[in-house]
């Protein structure tokens, strides 16, 4: 469950601009603010089932966006390569502060 929540949080971060305001709100409340379906339903004066259906549809949309655009997958790959680069530089060029500063700048761009 935690892995799914983390994945949805990342997908939401990458693709939230493609969602409707209501979809953004439901997803934000459910995944970021940890509201229950009942709490969201009460806030929007709709049924719990309506909230559940909306969230499930939105999750499917986010997965479809990721399938087509791969922003999260590319992010993970860049992060992995950055870690490998840091390890390599540490082993081969451990004394080169300028090189470490440049890597740090690259990391901060993410």
Curated annotation (Swiss-Prot):
Pfam families: UPF0122. It comes from the Bacteria. InterPro entries: RNA_pol_sigma_r3/r4-like (IPR013324), UPF0122 (IPR007394), UPF0122_fam_protein (IPR054831), WH-like_DNA-bd_sf (IPR036388). Belongs to the UPF0122 family. Might take part in the signal recognition particle (SRP) pathway. This is inferred from the conservation of its genetic proximity to ftsY/ffh. May be a regulatory protein. This is UPF0122 protein GWCH70_1086. It comes from Geobacillus sp. (strain WCH70). The lineage of its organism: Bacteria, Bacillati, Bacillota, Bacilli, Bacillales.
